[in-house]
A protein has these predicted regions:
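Bacterial N-terminal signal peptides
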Residues: 8-18
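Active-site groove signature of glycoside hydrolases
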Residues: 182-210, 287-291
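Hydrophobic faces of well-ordered beta-strands that scaffold small-molecule active sites
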Residues: 44-46, 77-79, 130-132, 200, ...
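Substrate-binding cleft of secreted/luminal carbohydrate-active enzymes
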Residues: 313-331
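Substrate-binding/active-site clefts of carbohydrate-active enzymes
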Residues: 25-46, 50-75, 81-195, 215-224
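Short, solvent-exposed turn/loop segments enriched in Gly/Ser/Thr/Pro and often Arg
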Residues: 78-92, 133-142, 203-209, 232-237, ...
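Carbohydrate-interacting/catalytic domains
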Residues: 19-78, 84, 117, 122, ...
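Active-site-proximal helices and loops of the catalytic beta/alpha 8
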Residues: 24-29, 33, 193, 203-285, ...
Length: 467
C-alpha cells in the first residue's frame, strides 16, 4: 500500500505522513532510536514479488535464483506478501497481495510451507536474511476473522465494517481491541518460530497505533531478538522502541520533483534535513528510487536518470532498496493496477542494457567496501550550481567519501566549497565489462555529464560516525 497517495492532495493529510517532532507531548528528536542489528544497518534490501520474479511465479522460482542475488550483492530479501489472497471484492484478475485471506497460510500459487522453509534455509546458507511482508492494518473481506471476530474491525455509524481510504478490497482492523493485538502478536511469533524469519516489513505501519508496535516488539524480542523491522511509513515515534527503519517518502517525492525538473537540487538536502532534525538520533530510513507502488524509475527518468537516482540511494545514509528487475533495467509496469495482474519481469532486457547489472553490482560492492558509505555521517557540501548538482560527504573512522550527482539531463559545471585533498575517484565504470575506477585526484571544479555521478574516497580522517 502506498502512503504518498494519502498526502498528494491536502496539506492536512501531509501532516499525518510527516509528523512534527512532538509526539504525545514528547519531543522524539531529543530521543535515541532503538539499536539495529549490524547486518541490517550495513545491508542492501532486495524486494521480491514472487508472482513476477520468475516464469513459474512461486517460492521455488525465487530460491532457484539465489546465486544470482548473492552475486548481485544484496543481503536482505524482502518477500512481498505470500499469504492467500482474498477473492471477495478483489482488484484485477488475481487480486492484491495486500488483501490477506489467511494470516497463517501460504498462497497455494506460491507453493507450500516446506517451500518457504527451503527458501529461508538456502538464503541463510548464502549469508542472506529473509523478511516477509505483514499486513496488519486490514484484511481481505473473506478472511475468516470477519465472521469469527467482527469486533476486530472498525465499523461505520451504521454498524457496518468499513475500509481504509479508498481501498475497497480490504476491511479495516481496530487496534483498540486488546484481543486483536494478542492475535497479531501470536501470528507474528508463529512465522518467526516456524520459518526462522529474520524480520518483517509492515504494510501501512503508520495506521496501527505506535503503542501496539511497541507492545508487539517487546513480546517478540523474547522469541528472536536479532531481527529487523521495517515500517512502511514515516512516523518518527515508531523508531524509538518498535521499528528499526522506515520509509523516507518525503525524500522520495523530492527526488521525483528534482529529477523531473520541478524543483532545484537543493530540495534533496532540504528534505533530508527536515527528517533528520525531527526523528530520533540515529534513526534509519530506507532509501528508494523505485518500488512496487511506483512506475519504474527507468520509465519516469529514463535510463541514465534512473541510474543517477539510484546512485543517490546507494551513497546517502540509510538502507538502500533494490526492487526486483531494477538491476536489469526492466520497464514492466509494477504499481497498481499492474500489481493486481500476472505480469512478469523481463529479465532478458539485461542483454540490451548491460550497464544496469554492472552499475548495481559495482555500486553495491563499493558500498560494502566503504564504512563511510554504510555508516558515515552526512555533511552537505555547498556548490555553485544549486539547480542541478547535489554534493555531500560521508565521514567514518576508516574512510571518507565525497559524492557529486548531476540531477539534470544536460552536462553541468560546479565548484565545490570543500577541501578535496586526498580524495580519489572510485566511481564504477559501467561502460566496460572489466573496467576499474579511474583513481583520478578530485578537483573542486567539476564538469559532470548529464545524469552523471562521481564518488571519491580518501583514507579516514578519524571521525567516527556519531549516528
Amino acid at each position: 500500500m502506498k502512503i504518498r497517495h494519502l498526502c498528494a492532495h491536502a496539506l492536512v493529510l501531509l501532516t499525518l505522513c510527516v509528523l512534527s517532532p512532538a509526539q504525545n507531548g514528547v519531543d522524539v528528536s531529543k530521543l535515541t532510536a532503538r539499536p539495529t542489528v549490524n547486518w541490517a544497518r550495513d545491508g542492501v534490501i532486495y524486494e521480491i514479488y514472487p508472482r513476477a520474479f520468475s516464469a513459474r511465479g512461486d517460492l521455488n522460482g525465487v530460491t532457484d535464483r539465489f546465486d544470482d542475488l548473492k552475486k548481485l550483492g544484496v543481503n536482505i530479501l524482502w518477500l512481498m506478501p505470500i499469504n492467500p489472497i482474498g477473492e471477495k471484492n478483489k482488484k484485477g484478475s488475481v487480486g492484491s497481495p495486500y488483501a490477506v485471506r489467511d494470516y497463517y497460510g501460504i498462497n497455494p500459487a506460491y507453493g507450500t510451507k516446506a517451500d518457504l522453509k527451503r527458501l529461508v534455509k538456502e538464503a541463510h546458507a548464502r549469508g542472506m536474511k529473509v523478511i516477509t511482508d505483514q499486513v496488519l492494518n486490514h484484511t481481505a473481506w473473506d478472511n475468516k476473522l470477519i465472521k469469527q471476530h467482527p469486533e476486530f474491525y472498525k465499523h461505520d455509524v451504521k454498524g457496518n465494517i468499513t475500509y481504509p481510504e479508498n481501498w475497497t478490497d480490504v476491511a479495516w482492523l481496530d487496534y483498540s481491541n486488546p484481543k486483536l493485538r494478542t492475535y497479531m502478536i501470536e501470528m507474528l511469533a508463529y512465522w518467526m518460530k516456524e520459518f526462522d524469519l529474520d524480520g518483517f516489513r509492515f504494510d501501512v505501519a503508520h495506521k496501527p497505533p505506535t503503542d501496539f508496535w511497541e507492545q508487539a516488539r517487546a513480546a517478540l524480542e523474547k522469541v528472536k531478538p536479532d531481527v529487523f523491522w521495517l515500517a512502511e511509513g514515516d512516523r518518527a515515534d515508531e523508531e524509538v522502541k518498535a521499528m528499526d527503519a522506515d520509509y523516507s517518502w518525503d525524500l522520495h517525492n523530492a527526488l521525483t520533483a528534482v529529477w523531473q525538473g520541478k524543483k532545484p537540487a537543493t530540495a534533496i538536502r532540504e528534505s533530508w534535513q527536515k527528517q533528520h532534525d525531527a526523528w530520533p538520533k540515529g534513526a534509519l530510513h530506507m532509501r528508494f528510487s523505485d518500488n512496487h507502488d511506483e512506475r519504474r524509475a527507468i520509465a519516469r527518468f529514463g535510463e541514465p536518470g534512473a541510474l543517477a537516482a539510484q546512485a543517490l540511494m546507494f551513497t546517502l545514509d540509510g538502507i538502500p532498496l533494490v526492487y526486483n528487475g531494477m538491476e536489469v533495467g526492466d520497464t514492466t509496469e509494477s504499481g497498481a493496477p499492474a500489481l493486481f495482474e500476472n505480469l512478469k519481469i523481463f529479465w532478458p532486457i539485461a542483454e540490451k542494457r548491460p550497464d544496469f547489472p554492472r552499475f548495481y553490482q559495482r555500486m553495491i560492492a563499493l558500498r560494502k567496501s566503504s564504512e563511510a558509505l554504510r555508516r558515515g555521517d552526512v555533511e552537505w557540501v555547498s556548490n555553485t550550481n544549486d539547480v542541478c548538482i547535489i554534493s555531500f560527504e560521508r565521514h567514518a573512522t576508516t574512510d571518507d567519501a565525497l559524492v557529486v550527482i548531476n540531477s539534470c539531463n544536460r552536462a553541468e559545471k560546479a565548484h565545490l566549497e570543500t577541501a578535496v585533498e586526498g580524495f580519489h575517484d572510485v566511481t564504477p565504470d559501467i561502460a566496460k565489462e572489466n573496467a576499474a575506477p579511474s583513481g583520478e585526484t578530485a578537483s573542486a571544479d567539476l564538469s559532470v555529464q548529464a545524469w552523471g555521478f562521481r564518488v571519491y574516497r580518501r583514507a579516514g580522517s578519524g571521525q567516527a560516525g556519531s549516528e
